[in-house]
A protein has these predicted regions:
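Short, extreme N-terminal segment that most often corresponds to the first beta-strand
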Residues: 1-25
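Charged interaction segments
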Residues: 23-116
Length: 116
């Protein structure tokens, strides 16, 4: 079964060409983004042409080729634009396994609550 996470990635319209170029060079990244994502909002996430991808219960391991290509894509986005151009949020199975990267899309965040 393995350890699974819920992940959201959003990027600005300015970052989309970098995303598409990276996906064009990596079949694994293309599959991750355009086949494996449970939800895709392509150009219509906000009124500015941003993209959003949402994966639920995904094995998000740095050693996987798709994740390596994804991380390289993020590096290119930061290099060409900056960290305001994206937001990546990952919630793991463990209560303290939460990660947030990028400074764009501040309305995407982790919310904890008590359920009963």
């Amino acid at each position: 079964m393995g350890y699974r996470s819920d992940v959201i990635f959003a990027c600005t319209a300015d970052a989309v060409p970098t995303l598409l170029a990276a996906a064009g060079k990596s079949a694994a990244l293309q599959e991750l983004l355009f086949a494996d994502a449970d939800e895709q909002l392509l150009g219509d996430y906000d009124s500015h042409g941003s993209y959003l991808f949402h994966w639920t219960s995904i094995k998000w391991y740095d050693g996987y080729p798709a994740i390596q290509a994804f991380n390289q894509m993020i590096e290119k986005i930061v290099e060409k634009l900056d960290e305001e151009a994206y937001r990546w949020v990952c919630v793991g199975e463990e209560m303290d396994d939460n990660e947030i990267e990028g400074f764009g899309f501040e309305h995407i965040y982790i919310s904890r609550e008590i359920a009963y």
